[in-house]
Amino acid sequence: MTFIEEFIYKGYLNQCTDLARLSAITQEAKIAAYIGFDCTATSLHIGSLMQIMILRLLQKHGHTPIVIIGGGTSKIGDPAGKDVTRKALTQEDIKRNAEGIKKSLSKFIKFGKDQGDAIILDNAEWLDSLNYLDFLRDFGSYFSVNRMLTMDSVKLRLDRSHHLSFLELNYMLLQSYDFYYLSKNYNCILQLGGSDQWGNIVIGADLIRKISGKEVFGMTTPLLTTASGAKMGKTAAGAVWLNEDLLSPYDYYQYWRNCEDADVMRFAKLYSELDIVELNKFESLVSEDINAAKKQLAYELTKLCHGERLAKLALETAVKIFEQGDIDENLHTFILAPEILQSGISAYNLFYNANLARSKSEARKIIRGKGAKINDQLVEDENMTIDTNFLRNRKVIKLSVGKKRHILVKV
């Protein structure tokens, strides 16, 4: 399959400025294409995984992926997809977040200076030195305010009478300038992004066409939700982060292992690197044994993010817990000060402190609803005292909420 054929087959396509022309060009020559990530957190989460897989797909087909870390644009904040103004980030926040995002991306993308290697850039390199008056003089006349106000990212805020600052309105100008800069200096002809980026991408393509007459393209991916309508990347317990310092490989594995039945085949197409033959076999497995398919999906995606060794460890840990009823030391752990356990702590307090409940009242509710276990034994009394007598021979206490959330308490 060609790059565009595989892009469509995997379910990545939402809109394209000229799909037929882009398909022809990518078959005739190798191109450079870019995706940007703003520095809003210390790690990317699975909400960005489709964009990351597209970067891998570009690399697979011999094209050059360019990753833009938004060290400059993060100082403003993209209004796209937001009802309220984003909280301003400090320079220290942006720098720390940029390093974390580079770590996330390096798990999936090969960066370097060899042919086919991805390029990573920080738009602060050119935006920080941009003179405002010069920018207005040289580029201001190319932007239509009338058109900017019709873009969904702006129009939705205005229609709801929500605040939209002049600062945020400038974001699409700077993103457009990014595309222009990459087109001029890296011969980049394609910008990719989520569906909420369509307006920004089109304005950038128009800017390049007006200034240089160069043919460039924009392509967006669909907004993804789970089969039940939940937003990708978020769970009741928090975001599904790609960096292991924020989410353990075991918990990452468990997220995919516990996905809805209706999502299994779709996720395999979107997020795995199984080829067509393997996907056809996997589709048969989904029909025959959904749990076996979920285990394979979770293993494949964890291997891609965390490597084969940690993926196998996560799989083995899950088998021991769910199929053999054993305690495994590789479970996520919570360290409790020895003096607390020596003097005793109430059951609901322990579950709350171990982050198995968002509040003490929720911990009480879980126990009252018979959803909590200690060392695989149902907790009947929320106020029961947990002390050193509950430590098992490996000096741990196993806490469980429902069938799928487990943690080891160590002292």
Curated annotation (Swiss-Prot):
InterPro entries: aa-tRNA-synth_Ic, Rossmann-like_a/b/a_fold, S4_RNA-bd_sf, Tyr-tRNA-ligase, Tyr-tRNA-ligase_bac-type, Tyr-tRNA-ligase_bac_1. Residues 345-411 form the S4 RNA-binding domain. PANTHER family: TYROSINE--TRNA LIGASE, MITOCHONDRIAL, TYROSYL-TRNA SYNTHETASE. A motif ('KMSKS' region) lies at residues 231-235. The keyword Transmembrane does not apply. GO terms for molecular function: ATP binding; RNA binding; tyrosine-tRNA ligase activity. Belongs to the class-I aminoacyl-tRNA synthetase family. TyrS type 1 subfamily. Catalyzes the attachment of tyrosine to tRNA(Tyr) in a two-step reaction: tyrosine is first activated by ATP to form Tyr-AMP and then transferred to the acceptor end of tRNA(Tyr). Its EC number is 6.1.1.1. GO terms for biological process: tyrosyl-tRNA aminoacylation. A motif ('HIGH' region) lies at residues 39-48. Pfam families: tRNA-synt_1b. Homodimer. CDD domains: S4 (cd00165), TyrRS_core (cd00805). It catalyses: tRNA(Tyr) + L-tyrosine + ATP = L-tyrosyl-tRNA(Tyr) + AMP + diphosphate + H(+). The keyword 4Fe-4S does not apply. PROSITE patterns: S4. One of its GO terms (cellular component) is cytosol. It is found in: Cytoplasm. Keywords: Aminoacyl-tRNA synthetase, ATP-binding, Cytoplasm, Ligase, Nucleotide-binding, Protein biosynthesis, RNA-binding. L-tyrosine binds at residues 34, 171, 175. ATP binds at residue 234. This is Tyrosine--tRNA ligase. The lineage of its organism: Bacteria, Pseudomonadati, Pseudomonadota, Alphaproteobacteria, Rickettsiales.
